[in-house]
Amino acid sequence: MFQDIGPYVFHNEYSSRKPEEDDILIVQKGRDILMNCGQTLPTVAQVRAVCSLAAEQAYYLLSIDEKHFFCTDVQVPETENLSYTSVMILREMNPGYMGFGGSVSWQLASWYDLHRYCGRCGTKTEHSERERAIICPKCGHTYYPRISPVVIIAIVDGDRILLTRYNRGGYRRHSLVAGFVEIGETLEDAVRREVMEEVGLHVKDIRYCESQPWPFSSSLIAGFFADVDGDPTVHLNTDGQDELAEGVWVSRDELVLEDSGMSLTWDMIRKFKEKHPISTIA
């Protein structure tokens, strides 16, 4: 999957290290990220040549082996060799470890950008010098990176799996039922609620499969398998806010793997097709 970058080693522990010229410098602008014309992430030296202030005000994010990633709050203008493009391009970047490192760096850079001012008192915030955190110098409130829990569910009816297709957005391939965990819910509660809300089914024998960090939505996704409990007829949500355009049962023999396996969704679908055992936990 996307985060499987071995033999490279991902280091997300905080460090106060300073940038060097060949380190990677992440510059984000909303859902876009600054890239070289060759679709590689720019170095500190390359950004410095365009905007020296951006390089001087860079701060450390993470490392993969000896490749260090930094970001800056300073907006860098586009040039003939540097331009902003959708962060989703990192999903298919080669080598894959750079795509993963770049996307997690974009996630952190976006979080820093959203917390430039204290949400409690409005004072300009500061970076902690002891941990990855943002501190308000006036009221003392501390902010930590946001991670939103998500569940994704492979709903099974014997030799069939339920595939869905989103009603909106750019992703047009089949997917699985998924959604954010609400306050006060267990992961298992979220599984039952999302399945009922989106496809009108009851499920049983909920069993954990695996998880995946997904930087593009600042999420940690927990994947579950669950069996249909009762009538398998799909009833898509029609309250005017329906997320799904389609929900269809597909047999194991008919199942075609549409994705490269970068996402948890298609890793779970592959496991179903190949009959991987998933133990019951709830």
Language-model features, listed with the residues they occupy:
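Residue-level detector of short, conserved catalytic/binding motifs and their immediate flanks
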Residues: D22-I24, V151, A222
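Short, well-ordered strand-loop elements centered on a beta-strand within folded domains, enriched
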Residues: D32-N36, K67-D73, R160-R165, L176, ...
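Unchanged
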Residues: L53-E92, V181-A282
